[in-house]
C-alpha cells in the first residue's frame, strides 16, 4: 500500500509510468531505425509503392517516423488504462493521484519521443555521410530539421494522439463495449482536426472518400494553440470518465 502524501504518490506514479513506457519507446524507436536503414541499404529488395518524395530514402529518421510514431502513441494510450489503472488502485492510490501521475508521464513521454527521433536523425546523417550513401534532404513540415520548431510540433501531435487513445480506452473500461464505441467518433474527430490544422495528409488519404477532409491553412501559432486545446479536452474527458470509475477485480 502506498501511504505517502498525495503529491508524492503522483510523482512516484509519474516516474514509474514514464519509466515503463520509456522502455517500450526505446525498443520501438530502435526497431523503426533498423527498418529504415534496411530500406536504405536494400532498396532493390524492399520496394514501396510511393513517390520519390515519400520514400524512406528521401527523409531523415525524424520525418520517416512521424506517422508510425503517432500510431504508436495512440496504441500505448489505449493500452495504458488496462495495463496500469487496476494495479495502482489496488495499491491504495486514489483515482486523482493516478490521473495526475499519468498525465505527467504522458507529457514527459511526448517530449522524450521527438528527442530520441531527433538524436537518431543526427546519427543517421553522420552514418550516411560517412558511408557515402546519397539521399535527398527533404523536410516534411518546411522547417530545418535540427531547429526547435519540428520538435515542438511533433511533441504536440504525439501528446494528442496518446490522450485520444487514453480517453477511448478509459471509456471502454468504464462503460463497456457499447459505451466505449461512442467515444471512438470523439477521439477520431479530434485526431482528424489535429491532422487538418497541421496540413497533414494522413486523414485525407484514409477518409477523403467518405468525408470532406482538407488541410486547413493556419499559422503555426494557431495550430499549436488548437493542439493544446485538443489535449486539454481529451484530458478533461478522461478525468470525467475516470473520476468515480469502479475497478474491475478480474
Segments predicted by a language model, with ranges:
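Alpha-helical transmembrane segments of multi-pass membrane proteins
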Residues: 15-27, 31, 96, 100-113, ...
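Long, hydrophobic alpha-helical segments
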Residues: 59-81
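Membrane-interface helix-boundary motifs at transmembrane edges
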Residues: 93-97, 169-179
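Secretory targeting signals
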Residues: 37-67, 105-175
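Hydrophobic cores of alpha-helical transmembrane segments in multi-pass inner/ER membrane proteins
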Residues: 71-78, 156-164, 226-238
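Hydrophobic alpha-helical transmembrane segments
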Residues: 1-58, 197-250
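Central hydrophobic cores of alpha-helical transmembrane segments
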Residues: 177-191
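Transmembrane helix boundary and interhelical loop/hinge segments in multi-pass membrane proteins
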Residues: 75-95
Amino acid at each position: 500500500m502506498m501511504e505517502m502524501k498525495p503529491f508524492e504518490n503522483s510523482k512516484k506514479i509519474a516516474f514509474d509510468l514514464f519509466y515503463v513506457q520509456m522502455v517500450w519507446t526505446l525498443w520501438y524507436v530502435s526497431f523503426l531505425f533498423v527498418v529504415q536503414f534496411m530500406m536504405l541499404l536494400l532498396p532493390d529488395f524492399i520496394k514501396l509503392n510511393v513517390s520519390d518524395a515519400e520514400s524512406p530514402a528521401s527523409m531523415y529518421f525524424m520525418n520517416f517516423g512521424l506517422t508510425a510514431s503517432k500510431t504508436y502513441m495512440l496504441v500505448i494510450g489505449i493500452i495504458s488504462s488496462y495495463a496500469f489503472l487496476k494495479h495502482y488502485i489496488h495499491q491504495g492510490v486514489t483515482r486523482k493521484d493516478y490521473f495526475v501521475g499519468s498525465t505527467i508521464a504522458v507529457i514527459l513521454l511526448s517530449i522524450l519521443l521527438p528527442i530520441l527521433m531527433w538524436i537518431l536523425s543526427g546519427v543517421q546523417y553522420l552514418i550516411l555521410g560517412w558511408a557515402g550513401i546519397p539521399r535527398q534532404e527533404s523536410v516534411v513540415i518546411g522547417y530545418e530539421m535540427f531547429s526547435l520548431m519540428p520538435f515542438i510540433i511533433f511533441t504536440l501531435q504525439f501528446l494528442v494522439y496518446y490522450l485520444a487513445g487514453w480517453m477511448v480506452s478509459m471509456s471502454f473500461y468504464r462503460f463497456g463495449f457499447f459505451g466505449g464505441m461512442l467515444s471512438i467518433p470523439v477521439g477520431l474527430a479530434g485526431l482528424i482536426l489535429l491532422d487538418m490544422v497541421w496540413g497533414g495528409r494522413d486523414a485525407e488519404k484514409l477518409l477523403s472518400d467518405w468525408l470532406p477532409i482538407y488541410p486547413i491553412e493556419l499559422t503555426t501559432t494557431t495550430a499549436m494553440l488548437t493542439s493544446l486545446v485538443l489535449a486539454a479536452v481529451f484530458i478533461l474527458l478522461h478525468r470525467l470518465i475516470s473520476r468515480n470509475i469502479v475497478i474491475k477485480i478480474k
